[in-house]
């Protein structure tokens, strides 16, 4: 038994017919084109994963930086409230 209920002999006959129809040069060029397309697809996936990792690292860095200085942020918020409160009384 072969693949999906197709015997090995049936697969060989189909392959011989394909070779006769397209020829080896055409099949070789199709294989090369298909290989190039797969390689390009893998490269684009790798680039996308790299970009996602860089974005995640940037976000983590920003969050860590914000977490390091909460007292400075609170002081800046307090200063802003004082300044904006003084502007209202003028």
From Swiss-Prot:
GO molecular function, one term: protein transmembrane transporter activity
GO biological process, one term: protein transport by the Tat complex
InterPro entries: TatA/B/E (IPR003369), TatA/E (IPR006312)
Top-rank taxon, per record: Bacteria
GO cellular component: TAT protein transport complex
Keyword Zinc: no
Keywords linked to the UniProt accession: Cell inner membrane, Cell membrane, Membrane, Protein transport, Translocation, Transmembrane, Transmembrane helix, Transport
Region Disordered: start-end pairs: 45-90
Compositional bias annotation for Basic and acidic residues: 45-68, 76-90
Residues passing through the membrane, by range: 2-22
Major localisation: membrane
Membrane topology: Single-pass membrane protein
Subcellular location: Cell inner membrane
Pfam families, sorted: TatA_B_E
Subunit structure: The Tat system comprises two distinct complexes: a TatABC complex, containing multiple copies of TatA, TatB and TatC subunits, and a separate TatA complex, containing only TatA subunits. Substrates initially bind to the TatABC complex, which probably triggers association of the separate TatA complex to form the active translocon.
Protein purpose: Part of the twin-arginine translocation (Tat) system that transports large folded proteins containing a characteristic twin-arginine motif in their signal peptide across membranes. TatA could form the protein-conducting channel of the Tat system.
Family per similarity comment: Belongs to the TatA/E family.
Protein name: Sec-independent protein translocase protein TatA
Organism (species): Nitrosococcus oceani (strain ATCC 19707 / BCRC 17464 / JCM 30415 / NCIMB 11848 / C-107)
Name of the gene encoding the protein in the UniProt record: tatA
